[in-house]
């Protein structure tokens, strides 16, 4: 038995369609709860490579260094160490998107005797380190000793030296005060004063000549040049040695045993040279050198 045709369903009203969609909202909410929550891209992931690849590079300000890590999100920029913001005082201001400013370092040198150490990043107080860059210099102990020795030598050379008297003028100056003393001896009626005689008890010690130098304690420096009278025997001895210097025993040579074979060969060689000189133009080259075959 065929079924009777069914009439089409009536068109629902707009209010009824909205009422039908309301019960679907709890189902949609249940589907969302089942799905895992999506993490934002800015947070760190569980794996280290994916975290470094997905994390966008942090933008650094003009005062931060390239090697300095970005500040954590919970720390304020005022809590950062002051050393990181110090180079910004010398570096010219740059726009925010231009990148980073190069780190500025200076090297402070200590004394040359103890070696030098390099300072870290420059502080903001003072002129810019680009104007006066200093470098460190490490010296070994041997180099320090060499530098100190040269410094002392320069100080000794810089001191003024006392002029030494010339040897030709020194005997004349020492003998000049002795001439009046010799001339004054016969006038007083006493014996002539002998400069080489020892002092008597009444006269006491002789006064040192004005040109003599005195050391501490009254010691007199011996004279450098002797008197002209004492030079004569020394001159005679030196002349005798110069004239007979080969007559000494140490210069005599002992007679040695003569090698007769060597004398014979030398004699034959000399005869061959004489015969070759006589027959140079007549004989050949080998005939003129007969002495070569005798050796």
Swiss-Prot record:
Residues annotated with Phosphoserine modification: 47
Organism: Homo sapiens (Human)
Region spans: Disordered: 1-133, 181-227
Disulfide bonds: none
One Pfam family this sequence matches: PRR18
Modified residues (Omega-N-methylarginine): 83, 188
Comp. bias (Low complexity): 14-29, 103-126, 181-192
Taxonomy of the source species: Eukaryota, Metazoa, Chordata, Craniata, Vertebrata
Biased composition (Pro residues): 1-13
Modified residues (Asymmetric dimethylarginine): 172
Record's keyword terms, sorted: Methylation, Phosphoprotein
Protein name: Proline-rich protein 18
Hydrolase in keyword set: no
């Amino acid at each position: 038995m065929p079924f009777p045709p069914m009439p089409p369903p009536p068109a629902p009203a707009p209010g009824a369609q909205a009422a039908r969609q309301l019960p679907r909202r709890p189902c949609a909410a249940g589907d969302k709860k089942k799905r895992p929550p999506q993490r934002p891209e800015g947070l760190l992931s569980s794996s280290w490579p994916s975290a470094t690849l997905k994390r966008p590079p942090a933008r650094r300000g003009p005062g931060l260094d390239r090697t300095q890590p970005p500040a954590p999100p919970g720390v304020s920029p005022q809590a950062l160490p002051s050393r990181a913001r110090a180079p910004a005082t010398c570096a010219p201001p740059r726009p925010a998107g231009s990148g980073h400013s190069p780190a500025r370092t200076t090297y402070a040198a200590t004394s040359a005797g103890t070696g030098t150490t390099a300072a870290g990043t420059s502080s903001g107080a003072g002129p810019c380190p680009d104007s006066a860059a200093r470098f460190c210099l490490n010296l070994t102990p041997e180099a320090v000793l060499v530098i100190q020795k040269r410094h002392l030598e320069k100080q000794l050379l810089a001191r003024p030296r006392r002029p030494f008297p010339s040897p030709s003028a020194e005997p004349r100056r020492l003998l000049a005060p002795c001439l009046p003393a010799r001339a004054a001896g016969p006038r007083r009626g006493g014996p002539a004063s002998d400069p080489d005689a020892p002092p008597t008890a009444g006269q006491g010690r002789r006064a040192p000549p004005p040109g003599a130098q005195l050391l501490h304690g009254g010691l007199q420096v011996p004279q450098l040049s002797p008197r002209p009278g004492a030079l004569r025997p020394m001159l005679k001895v030196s002349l005798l040695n110069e004239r007979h210097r080969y007559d000494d025993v140490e210069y005599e040579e002992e007679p040695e045993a003569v090698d007769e074979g060597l004398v014979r060969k030398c004699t034959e060689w000399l005869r061959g040279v004489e015969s070759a000189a006589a027959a140079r133009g007549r004989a050949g080259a080998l005939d003129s050198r007969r002495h070569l075959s005798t050796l």
